[in-house]
């Protein structure tokens, strides 16, 4: 790994699915050899993902590589089904992700405008995460 720590948590939010896919392809390319990148990339659908599965994957060491990539598509479903008493446990995981893990949450959402103010249409459903991100923008 290089001297500077790489971020371990990414939130890709919006409705530009083409751009989101391009960013994810870039993350995968950053893993190096494509065959090793495939071995070190895990994709989940947030609708079916449990916290325990995410935690196990996030803490697994990469195989013959510096990093592993975990992509959670439809992450809004995962984030909104998180019981209030589990959100802190989830944030603790995000806060303590090993440098060998890059966790990417993909949240399809749209910006809307009300009284001249822009906001995310579904932002309240996962505000606990975006609040944490504002406080921990170094992760």
Where are these regions (language model features)?
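Conserved beta/loop motifs at nucleotide-recognition and modification sites
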Residues: 1-139
